[in-house]
């Protein structure tokens, strides 16, 4: 099924793919008349990734029918990283088994990536009984994860009324990042009960890599439960991570 899809701002799209490529080696993207979607798990099955990009966020979206295309994420990332912020990204597929990627700026550069067979995972995004929901600025969570990585390989999230804390403890060091609604970095918090859970820093680092400074990130978690991290792409697109907890001894 041929298609042509145009996205203004190649660098932004590249950052999105780079974030996912840190966790998965290959992906099956479903291309329909409504938009592009992808759901995958990392090889260790610790993180579930759910991506949804509606047709409305693209400047041109010509798709007739439905097709699933499999790609090597590292190859796709390397090509897209060649794009600049003001360049236009064009994705095309004809009758051949290739994805054609064009970067249009002062010149038009075109790459062809071979499509591969990727097994689609049949897993739903579960509805979990989260007891805490936090909306935070992207820069805050990115810096907190960097700080935590200096002292430990896991970070604890703690939410209670009007207060959200991220804490990491090593053998001799510890770091704590605390926010209340008086701080600019914490935009909203809803807590049913005091909630605590720990998560692996290596996974968190990959998940927050593509966040912009002013991006709003929604974090939902429960006591020793998976954490759902969600952020929007141009208001309507959405990237969700579901990360298994680090069970503490």
UniProtKB/Swiss-Prot annotation:
Keyword DNA-binding: yes
Species of origin: Pyrococcus abyssi (strain GE5 / Orsay)
NCBIfam families per record: pcna, PRK01115.1-2, PRK01115.1-4
Top-level taxon of the source organism: Archaea
Cross-referenced InterPro entries: DNA_clamp_sf, Pr_cel_nuc_antig, Pr_cel_nuc_antig_C, Pr_cel_nuc_antig_CS, Pr_cel_nuc_antig_N
Protein name: DNA polymerase sliding clamp
PROSITE patterns attached to this UniProt entry: PCNA_1
Keywords tagged on the record: DNA replication, DNA-binding
């Amino acid at each position: 099924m041929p298609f042509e899809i145009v996205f203004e701002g190649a660098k932004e799209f590249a950052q999105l793919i780079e974030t996912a490529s840190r966790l998965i080696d290959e992906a099956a993207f479903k291309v329909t008349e409504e938009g592009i979607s992808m759901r995958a798990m990392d090889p260790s099955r610790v993180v579930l990734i759910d991506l949804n990009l509606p047709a409305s966020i693209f400047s041109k979206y010509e798709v007739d029918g439905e097709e699933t295309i499999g790609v090597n994420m590292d190859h796709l990332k390397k090509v897209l990283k060649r794009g600049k912020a003001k360049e236009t990204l064009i994705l095309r597929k004809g009758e051949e088994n290739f994805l054609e990627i064009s970067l249009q700026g002062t010149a038009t550069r075109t790459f062809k990536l071979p499509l591969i067979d990727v097994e689609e995972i049949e897993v739903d995004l579960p509805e979990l009984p989260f007891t805490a929901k936090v909306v935070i600025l992207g820069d805050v969570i990115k810096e907190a994860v960097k700080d935590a990585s200096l002292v430990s390989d896991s970070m604890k999230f703690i939410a209670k009324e009007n207060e959200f804390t991220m804490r990491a403890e090593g053998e001799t060091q510890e770091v704590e990042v605390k926010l209340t609604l008086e701080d600019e970095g914490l935009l909203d918090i809803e807590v049913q009960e005091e909630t605590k859970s720990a998560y692996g820093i290596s996974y968190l680092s990959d998940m927050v890599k593509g966040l912009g400074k002013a991006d709003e990130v929604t974090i939902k978690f429960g006591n020793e439960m998976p954490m759902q991290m969600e952020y929007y792409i141009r208001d309507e697109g959405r990237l969700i991570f579901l990360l298994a907890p680090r069970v503490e001894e």
